[in-house]
Amino acid sequence: MRQRRISGSNLMMVLCVVAMCRAVPINDLIYRASQQSDKLHALSSMLTQELGSEAFPIDRVLACHTSSLQTPTDKEQALQVSESDLLSLARSLLQAWSDPLEVLSSSTNVLPYSAQSTLSKTIQKMQEHSKDLKDGLDILSSKMGPAAQTITSLPFIETNEIGQDKITKLLSCFRRDSHKIDSFLKVLRCRAANMQPQVC
């Protein structure tokens, strides 16, 4: 009975948080999402720099499991894409990294001992930020219509063995995609604030 009360209390807390978020204006939701994505990209950049994977060969980055998704390649192209489509792209990329981040989290033992602790803690933070950002974008998409709610499936094929080279590749791919997500949300933030395109 006590466990049931606790579960009921947790459910009520979640519902209250969702209700409050749904009452928040779209501009504020976009601003919060942009801040969250900025933190996520900063973490991924820091980790790739620490592990020396920043200069990963571009031809191998093109082999990322998300490469099939057609996305704007620069700010000028992103400015031509609708708000709903930008949000859909950001959500698709974010969803595509749910499983790979789990794989990275469970594979830190293959790295040199000195790097294991740093990688483990940072990936845990990236998972937390990803989940928070996903929850925020889900609420935001519900306010922006069907197009924003569309998610393109980008399957991740997990291999039985994962070594340092595979970890390096995944981290480089995640840094690339987290930069895209951050860029798309910054464009949305600019539009929500009615800023001129040239200053976005």
Curated annotation (Swiss-Prot):
GO terms for biological process: positive regulation of cell population proliferation; positive regulation of receptor signaling pathway via JAK-STAT; response to nutrient levels. One of its GO terms (cellular component) is extracellular space. Keywords: Disulfide bond, Hormone, Secreted, Signal. GO terms for molecular function: hormone activity. This is Prolactin-2. Residues 1-23 form the signal peptide. Pfam families: Hormone_1 (PF00103). Disulfide bonds join 64-173, 190-200. The keyword RNA-binding does not apply. PANTHER family: PROLACTIN (PTHR11417:SF5), SOMATOTROPIN,PROLACTIN (PTHR11417). Belongs to the somatotropin/prolactin family. It is found in: Secreted.
